[in-house]
Amino acid sequence: MTSEDHAQHDGHAHDHDPTFYRSPRDAAAGPPEKLAYVAAFAKPADKPDAIAVVDTDPASPSYATVVGFTELPHTGDELHHFGWNACSSALCPTGDHRHGDRRYLVVPGIRSSRVYILDTKQTPTSPQVTRVLGPEELGKRAGYSRPHTVHCGPGYLYMSCLGGANGEDGPGGVALLDHATFDVIGQFEHDRGDQYLAYDVWWHINDGVLVTSEWATPSMIEDGIVPELLLGRKYGHRLHFWDMQTRNHVQTVDLGDQHQMALELRPAHDPARKYGFVGVVVSVEDLSASIWVWHEDNGQWAATKVITIPAEPAPAEQLPPLLQGFGAVPPLVTDIGLSVDDKYLYVSCWGTGELKQYDVSDPFNPVQTGSVRIGGIVGRRPHPARPEEPLAGGPQMVEVSRDGKRVYFTNSLYGAWDEQFYPDGVGAWMTKLDVGENGGISFDPRFFLEGNVFRGRRVHQVRLEGGDASSDSYCYS
């Protein structure tokens, strides 16, 4: 089905952007992505960061190559996560699909607190910078800095931020931006309760429930992970639930302070399902990582641990200084991805160099259905396309196609932390997995990009043309 065919679906020709979908089922049936947009950042910041455009069309002669590279006008940004100006939430009853399309990438610099707006419509392989929001605008109007996650919601763009104004430690929170002008409107939080740390943001859109998670303040991360703070259990370990209408804090769910860094939020895509998954980077008790499900329990929110991934023993001499005293490699679950049909959860183990697939049809009883190994602190496993080339880094930012058949991932976590866990260099690479009809994952031997193709930058988040499994939310089942 072409984009034009899809626009004619149900007779509503061109009444909204054809990449907006009313339901997860519709999204999965849409045309596959032909391009991926990838955040590429310079470390050290001796040149501008960029958005790399990668050809993902297997029938294309330039498949699995960088076909566009838009450098930004400043240095020192550290591109990290980014999102679209508009998406399927525009089709919600509270949305307005008449005045927008999936055209602009909203790209924050997590170091600089600048936010770039890039137009992908005129030439999709060469996005053009159309506006730059300076850090002073975010600080003055919202009281925040160090922007992280961007989500397109009905009414506003929601952008989580780690720091207070001007890079101060906090509290962090969520800034609201205008969909059309990209002006910063202000803080989301009317009453933040006991929330101080920030990281990710997402929601149960039909229920008017917003969820946020916790990483750290800027001073706790920008010069690297601080071992004393980690062992002192000072990094984030709580989830926060909010009323989207009143913008008031409703409830805090503490996972336990041994579970340090509760990061990525992946709510079910089916709006009738009021649960979601969150990944925890590390337990200070045994270096394990874990996956939790948040859910309702007698009218309150609760969280249940459903997956534990143990650390892997390793000789001290093979470990970076940060880990030598522990004699083990922590999995370091730093990203997760949930397929649009809510069936498979993908878990990045950046430390051990493994990407796991779980069947989460029953979210309280996940079953591992697939695994691949690549990179890793100790293993340094190669990609099948280059079997003689050991790789640093490991599966990190993971993105799942809308139809659930393809999984893309990159290998850098965060500039200052890359050096601590991979002190001899993390490199830069991106690869893709194919998903079996009944589960299971395997490398696409044709899809492996590394090194010079990214022009001396490291790579982090991937966004797929037309939306992906972590870009859109839906109001209809």
Model-derived features: positions:
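Beta-propeller domains
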Residues: 9-16, 28-100, 106-134, 169, 191-363, ...
